[in-house]
Regions:
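Hydrophobic residues within well-ordered alpha-helices
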Residues: 28-29, 81, 129-131
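Extracytoplasmic small-molecule ligand-binding "clamshell" domains
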Residues: 1-44
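Bilobed "Venus flytrap"/periplasmic-binding protein-like clamshell domains
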Residues: 1-7, 64-122, 127, 204-209
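Solvent-exposed coil/turn segments that connect beta secondary-structure elements
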Residues: 40-42, 70-73, 86, 91, ...
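Stable alpha-helical elements in mature extracytoplasmic
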Residues: 20, 24, 36, 97, ...
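Periplasmic-binding protein-like
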Residues: 59-69, 148-192, 196-211
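A ligand-binding cleft/hinge motif common to bilobed small-molecule-binding domains
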Residues: 37-49, 128-162
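A glycine-rich, hydrophobic loop/mini-helix early in the fold
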Residues: 37-77
Length: 211
């Protein structure tokens, strides 16, 4: 990292990409990481804000969760959904891809006993499976790029507000210089990200305006 403040405070910068919820939980629960892009509920579940001082420095926007189909708008009705093939995320901590749809299905009296649930490793894989005809309905967010291959007319809202991804920094002291330097780093990452969702970043207050 070329930021002089970060170079001064850290001997080296190492990037770790978690491959599963297990990785994420382990890194947060044991205080392994200094900077993390995760959901707020994971930090709260392990008390990492109190134990390790994980502090939110920036956040991407909240979003909505949907049941998305290829040729018709799904109906939130047990009789309609019975026999359908569902695509969900194989990440129990994912709200739009796992928690929200599982909650809705449970409320409707649906489970793996009366519907076919297939699990996939990413939202990209969910879309591939839907387009390939492997499943009838997926649960996910709606991205701008989805307009190219899917129709929002065939997206049924499940939950209007799902907490977005957030950046947390380990701060066991009030290190304002580091707080502001890390904000600039994540802003640079956001500005250069290819996906529109990640280009939108809300910075926590406490620093001079970032240019």
């Amino acid at each position: 990292c070329s930021n002089k403040i970060i170079k001064r405070q850290y001997g080296e910068v190492r990037i770790v990409i978690g491959q599963s919820d297990y990785d994420t939980f382990r890194y947060i629960n044991h205080g392994v990481v200094d900077l993390a892009l995760i959901k707020k509920n994971v930090v709260e579940a392990f008390g990492a804000d109190e134990i390790y001082g994980l502090t939110r420095i920036a956040a991407h926007p909240n979003y909505s969760a949907y049941f998305i189909s290829l040729r018709e708008k799904p109906v939130l009705d047990k009789e309609y959904l019975l026999g359908k093939r569902f695509g969900l995320l194989d990440y129990p901590s994912s709200r739009s891809g796992h928690i929200v749809p599982k909650t809705v299905m449970q409320e409707l009296g649906l489970s793996a006993n009366n519907v076919d649930i297939n699990y996939y490793s990413s939202h990209k894989e969910l879309r591939r499976a839907l387009l390939a005809g492997e499943v009838d309905i997926i649960s996910s967010y709606w991205a701008v790029e989805d307009n190219e291959s899917l129709s929002k007319n065939y997206a049924m809202p499940l939950q209007e507000t799902v907490s977005g991804m957030q950046w947390f920094l380990k701060m066991q002291t009030k290190n304002t210089d580091l707080f502001c330097a890390m904000q600039q780093v994540v802003k640079d990452i956001s500005d250069s990200h290819p996906r529109p969702y990640y280009k939108t970043l809300i910075l926590e207050e406490g620093c001079a305006t970032h240019e």
